[in-house]
């Protein structure tokens, strides 16, 4: 059973055991507008919490996506290479960005649950 968390930088995480799927929230993609390009980390990349890991580029602006946790990228969403608009259409499902390992479970305590995230975006 997976559990979903959110960051103040508008990323969502689905945690299932030691596997974490990361994406941008529906709110974030609305703020960005239509995405035209997504630059993802390479599989095998070791990320530190807070490190810029990906870039999402829209017709309005380019924005960094930060790693919400320490871990290693094990898979990227290859579908976004040809279809970056999946992030706009299905931000919190098929529009995920990368999957990574969970190295330090205590970092999850610093994340937001759904209610706290909804309060943040008001």
From Swiss-Prot:
Pfam families assigned to the protein according to its UniProt record, in alphabetical order: GCV_H
Note on how the cofactor is bound? Binds 1 lipoyl cofactor covalently.
Which Gene Ontology cellular component terms are annotated? cytosol; glycine cleavage complex
Q: Name one GO biological process term.
A: glycine decarboxylation via glycine cleavage system
What are its cofactors? (R)-lipoate
Between which residues do disulfide bridges form? Answer: none
Stored InterPro entries:
2-oxoA_DH_lipoyl-BS (IPR003016), Biotin_lipoyl (IPR000089), GCV_H (IPR002930), GCV_H/Fam206 (IPR033753), GCV_H_sub (IPR017453), Single_hybrid_motif (IPR011053)
Annotated ranges, domain Lipoyl-binding: 19-101
List residues modified as N6-lipoyllysine. 60
Query: Which of UniProt's keywords are assigned here?
Result: Lipoyl
Q: Does the keyword Iron apply?
A: no
User: Could you tell me what this protein does?
Assistant: The glycine cleavage system catalyzes the degradation of glycine. The H protein shuttles the methylamine group of glycine from the P protein to the T protein.
PANTHER family from the entry? GLYCINE CLEAVAGE SYSTEM H PROTEIN, GLYCINE CLEAVAGE SYSTEM H PROTEIN-RELATED
Instruction: State the similarity comment.
Output: Belongs to the GcvH family.
Please describe the quaternary structure of this protein: The glycine cleavage system is composed of four proteins: P, T, L and H.
Name of the protein described by the UniProt record: Glycine cleavage system H protein
Name of the gene encoding the protein in the UniProt record: gcvH
């Amino acid at each position: 059973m997976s559990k979903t968390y959110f960051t103040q930088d508008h990323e969502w995480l689905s945690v299932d055991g030691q596997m974490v799927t990361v994406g941008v929230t529906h709110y974030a993609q609305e703020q960005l507008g239509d995405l035209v390009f997504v630059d993802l980390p390479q599989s095998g990349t070791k990320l530190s919490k807070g490190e810029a890991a990906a870039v999402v580029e829209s017709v309005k602006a380019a924005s960094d996506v930060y790693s919400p946790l320490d871990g290693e990228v094990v898979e990227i969403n290859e579908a976004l290479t040809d279809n970056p608009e999946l992030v706009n259409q299905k931000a919190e499902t098929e529009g995920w960005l990368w999957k990574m390992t969970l190295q330090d479970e205590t970092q999850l305590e610093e994340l937001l649950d759904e209610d706290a995230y909804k309060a943040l975006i008001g």
